[in-house]
Amino acid sequence: NLYQFKNMIKCTVPSRSWLDFANYGCYCGRGGSGTPVDDLDRCCQIHDNCYNEAGKISGCWPYFKTYSYECSQGTLTCKGDNNSCAASVCDCDRLAAICFAGAPYNNDNYNINLKARCQ
């Protein structure tokens, strides 16, 4: 769920507030359209698509689904006791948090004009 995703981001990118990722580019945060502005925004586009796929599992609501995971020294592990929905959502969040850690953060792409740049 989004609370756990926030904590995963804190695990892999401890130097930044998770809020820095909540309104970034065309895909980080609510919605998503157009061409991603950079690699970090592409991480969010992939995460959005991953949630859409997880949502196809019967009764699976990715934004609200809790799962079991652990963070150890910046390494995320989804636990084996997750059901198929929880395992899918956990993996979406884990992969996105890892992607965030490897992508440069461009302050110019925070809080951009979505109508102008995300067609």
UniProtKB/Swiss-Prot annotation:
A Gene Ontology cellular-component term: extracellular region
Catalyzed reactions per annotation: a 1,2-diacyl-sn-glycero-3-phosphocholine + H2O = a 1-acyl-sn-glycero-3-phosphocholine + a fatty acid + H(+)
GO biological process: arachidonate secretion; lipid catabolic process; phospholipid metabolic process
Superkingdom field: Eukaryota
Enzyme class, broadest EC rank: hydrolase
Cofactor: how bound: Binds 1 Ca(2+) ion.
Coiled-coil positions: none
Keywords: Calcium, Disulfide bond, Hydrolase, Lipid degradation, Lipid metabolism, Metal-binding, Secreted
Pfam families linked to this entry: Phospholip_A2_1 (PF00068)
Gene3D superfamilies in alphabetical order: Phospholipase A2 domain (1.20.90.10)
Amino-acid biosynthesis is among the record's keywords: no
Cofactor(s) listed: Ca(2+)
S-S bonds: 11-71, 26-118, 28-44, 43-99, 50-92, 60-85, 78-90
GO molecular function: calcium ion binding; calcium-dependent phospholipase A2 activity; phospholipid binding
Annotated EC: 3.1.1.4
Expression by tissue: Expressed by the venom gland.
Chain residues that bind Ca(2+): 27, 29, 31, 48
Role noted for this protein: PLA2 catalyzes the calcium-dependent hydrolysis of the 2-acyl groups in 3-sn-phosphoglycerides.
Name by which UniProt lists this protein: Acidic phospholipase A2 E
The organism of origin for this protein: Naja oxiana (Central Asian cobra)
